[in-house]
């Protein structure tokens, strides 16, 4: 059992939904020792609360939209990224505090822009995740992109997609790294900022049971390192559905 939780959904209007969820936040449930146990175990426990507003809208010609805003609150104890002296945790012998509650929020937008004769069309999306930057090394994730279903009349079940993102290192961690380098110039640590991934993929439906998705990614400033060489990655995903 990976997690225990409960979710309630309240229909405010035909287009507006409010969702509230509570989940057991116990990292021990992901261990190999958990196996097929139907209960959670471990000494570290907490609760993750999620509240979400979802607005759905159906426009003319089947151009629907889906818009979500959510807030996440966790009571699981987490070690802060910066120690009491203002340096990155682990770089000096100074104490590191524990944060017993952290918060995050997210925004997700999807909008159908066009419809074609095959029933597909262009759908765009934008998303943002903003984490608690005192405990999460990745402070913010932004993504923008779109995909076209049925891009060709002869390929009504295929999909082509494109996305651009920005993964940002916690501002608190970056500031602490710069502060450390100011005072320990002979033992500098790498200051990380932003990483920019770009991806193009094509989902090719061989049969209803077999799909192939080749993709290519280009990553600017990998791991937020401005001095790192940009990387290109080619991938191939095989999906079987029987």
Question: What positions do the PLM features span?
Answer:
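Short sequence motifs at beta-strands and strand-loop junctions characteristic
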Residues: 43-45, 99-103, 136-138, 191-194, ...
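Solvent-exposed loop/turn segments connecting transmembrane beta-strands
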Residues: 29, 99, 130-141, 223-228
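Transmembrane beta-barrel strands of outer-membrane/channel proteins
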Residues: 18-24, 67-73, 122-130, 144, ...
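Short loop/turn motifs that connect adjacent beta-strands in outer-membrane beta-barrel proteins
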Residues: 15, 57-66, 114-122, 150-159, ...
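Outer-membrane beta-barrel "beta-signal"
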Residues: 230-242
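Aromatic- and glycine-enriched pocket-lining scaffold segments that form the walls
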Residues: 1-52
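Residue-level signature of outer-membrane beta-barrel architecture
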Residues: 10-12, 55-57, 111-113, 148-150, ...
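Membrane-embedded beta-strands of outer-membrane beta-barrel proteins
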Residues: 6, 51-53, 107-109, 124, ...
